[in-house]
From Swiss-Prot:
Subcellular location, record wording: Cytoplasm
Residues that span the membrane, as ranges: none
Stated name of the protein: Protein GrpE
Annotated source species: Shewanella sp. (strain W3-18-1)
Keywords: Chaperone, Cytoplasm, Stress response
Protein task: Participates actively in the response to hyperosmotic and heat shock by preventing the aggregation of stress-denatured proteins, in association with DnaK and GrpE. It is the nucleotide exchange factor for DnaK and may function as a thermosensor. Unfolded proteins bind initially to DnaJ; upon interaction with the DnaJ-bound protein, DnaK hydrolyzes its bound ATP, resulting in the formation of a stable complex. GrpE releases ADP from DnaK; ATP binding to DnaK triggers the release of the substrate protein, thus completing the reaction cycle.
Chief localisation class: cytoplasm
Subunit (UniProt): Homodimer.
Similarity section: Belongs to the GrpE family.
Length: 206
């Protein structure tokens, strides 16, 4: 076989190899292109899915917050209703307690004829005060205490050698508070002090 024949055969083989390589490269490029398109599609699907998840998550969070707000408002409404009902009950109870107080003041505990009545009213009053104290109702009896305008209402002032100035010398009507909130101030007479003391003055509500 001549050199020319050998060269021609080699060229033919090389062309065949190059053709195969070219075809393989084209096929690979096509596969890679399709793979890239598929990857982009999957990435878009993933992004859409994540967006939906975030949207649903946000909806769940908003719904949970709304439920929490509704629950909180309902609890506040119940608390307000309970406070209103308790305050109304306590205010309606004050005249009963006042009547018991007046009955005790008008009855002589040393008189055998009225001693049993006095003891009965006193026991009933104590039992009632103990019962309402469980609901936060507390009696204000400031006898001998310093005048407190937040809890006491002065109906007058008098000189007194027995009580320092601005001291409650007489409780005309006891006050009451509900859970540390004033229901009614105590009606009191306030001392101006003795003759040697400097005269004290306070606002007196008519």
């Amino acid at each position: 076989m001549s050199n020319e024949s050998i060269k021609a055969e080699q060229d033919l083989i090389q062309e065949g190899v190059e053709s195969e390589v070219s075809t393989a490269e084209a096929s690979l490029v096509d596969e890679l292109t399709q793979a890239n398109f598929r990857i982009e599609e999957l990435e878009q699907l993933l992004a859409d899915a994540l967006a939906k998840v975030e949207e649903q998550k946000d909806s769940v969070i908003r719904a949970a917050a709304e439920v929490d707000n509704i629950r909180r408002r309902a609890a506040m409404d119940v608390e307000k209703a309970n406070k209103f009902a308790l305050e109304k009950f306590a205010n309606e109870l004050l005249p009963v307690l006042d009547n018991m107080e007046r009955a005790l003041m008008g009855t002589n505990p040393e008189d055998e004829a009225t001693k049993a009545i006095y003891q009965g009213v006193e026991l009933t009053q104590k039992s009632l005060l103990t019962a309402v104290a469980k609901f936060g109702v507390k009696q204000i009896d400031p006898q001998g205490e310093s005048f407190n305008p937040d809890q006491h209402q002065a109906i007058g002032m008098q000189p007194s050698a027995d009580f320092p100035a601005n001291t409650v010398m007489l409780v005309m009507q006891k006050g009451y508070e509900l859970n540390s909130r004033l229901l009614r101030p105590a009606m009191v007479m306030v001392s101006q002090g003795g003759p040697s003391q400097e005269t004290a003055t306070i606002d007196i509500e008519a």
